[in-house]
Design a protein with these regions (language model features):
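Clamp-loader machinery-focused feature within the broader ASCE/P-loop NTPase space
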Residues: 2-149
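Short gly/ser-rich anion-binding loops that grip negatively charged ligand groups
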Residues: 108-112, 167, 256
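Charged, glycine-rich active-site and insertion segments that engage polyanionic ligands
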Residues: 1-50, 58-59, 66-67, 163-166, ...
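Loop/turn-to-beta-strand initiation segments
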Residues: 133-137, 162-168
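Residues immediately C-terminal
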Residues: 145-146, 160, 176
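Conserved adenine-binding aromatic site and its adjacent loop/helix in ATP-hydrolyzing domains
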Residues: 124, 156, 183
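Arginine/glycine-rich "motif VI" loop of SF2 helicases in the C-terminal RecA-like domain
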Residues: 73, 160, 207
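Conserved catalytic/switch belt of AAA+ P-loop NTPases
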Residues: 127, 152-166
Length: 273
């Protein structure tokens, strides 16, 4: 993953089209939904960046103003990001000082759900005045990682939003959200790109064309998931051999994979079947 201060890569074309369409619509809360691997987080961040940008255009944030820079370096005072701590770390977002200290001192492990303490901080954030005068944004990803207490705290803020506050919830399992949260948001289902468009995007990320097709099949047609496989999973050749190996009961094909990676590989294989 690139560092948080690096220039943001351009959105995949199917996400850029969705961003442009959503920016033409009004609403204080959006729910971006669809299977994992389609780019919910990237689209959510693009919307937040555009809403907070000092010089936004029809295609979103300018990428050069002070607001855009603050988002790139993860210090924007008007953007509140709610994620499991594991996801915060993976995506380059800093934890608050207390949480980071608890983890550094090995008092606990990074959370895999959105913590109640973080949601309470977000409620306080919602009540503050915008620091830069462009409103405020709360980004929640993956939204289904809220527990019941966190979800109810968010619901109250959704029901009584401040005039300059927007929400963007990105979910890979929207059916797990409270129905009342879903009803308070404008829903948008992420589009599936065509195989050709997805393969072209993977090639643009540095994946060989022949490998892109194999990885895309292994990921069930989901481009982001295919890119993660290219960087962290078995080789494309191994993916190509995996179905027959499993038919033979040959578990050696996954012998060099850590248990979580092996489980994910089998899940993707079952998805394809």
């Amino acid at each position: 993953m690139s560092g948080p201060a690096d220039p943001a890569p351009p959105l995949a074309p199917w996400l850029a089209r969705a961003r442009d369409a959503l920016l033409r619509q009004r609403g204080h809360a959006w729910l971006l939904q669809g299977p994992s691997g389609l780019g919910q987080y990237e689209l959510a961040l693009a919307l937040a960046s555009a809403w907070l940008c000092e010089q936004p255009g029809p295609q979103g944030a300018c990428g050069h103003c002070a607001s855009c820079h603050a988002i790139k370096v993860r210090t924007h005072a008007d953007l509140c990001v709610l994620m499991p701590e594991v996801a915060m770390h993976e995506l380059g977002w800093p934890l608050d000082e207390k949480a980071q200290s608890e983890i550094d001192d090995k008092k606990r492990k990074p959370s895999r759900e959105i913590r109640v303490e973080a949601m309470r901080d977000a409620v306080g954030f919602a009540q503050r005045t915008s620091a830069r005068g462009r409103g405020k944004v709360v980004l929640v990803y993956p939204a289904e990682r809220m527990n019941a207490i966190s979800a109810n705290a968010l619901l109250k803020t959704l029901e009584e939003p401040a005039g300059d506050l927007r929400f963007v919830l990105a979910s890979e399992a929207a059916w797990q959200l409270l129905p009342t949260i879903r009803s308070r948001c404008l829903g948008h289902t992420l589009p599936w790109p065509s195989a050709q468009e997805a393969q072209e995007w993977l090639v643009a990320q540095g994946i060989a064309a022949a490998e892109a097709a194999v990885l895309l099949r292994a990921a069930g047609g989901r481009p982001d998931a295919a890119l993660r496989l290219a960087r962290n999973g078995p080789s494309p050749k191994a993916w190509g051999l995996l179905p027959r190996a499993m038919q033979r009961g040959d578990v050696a094909a996954l012998a060099d994979q850590a248990p979580p990676a092996a489980i994910e590989a089998l899940q993707k294989l079952c998805h394809d079947l």
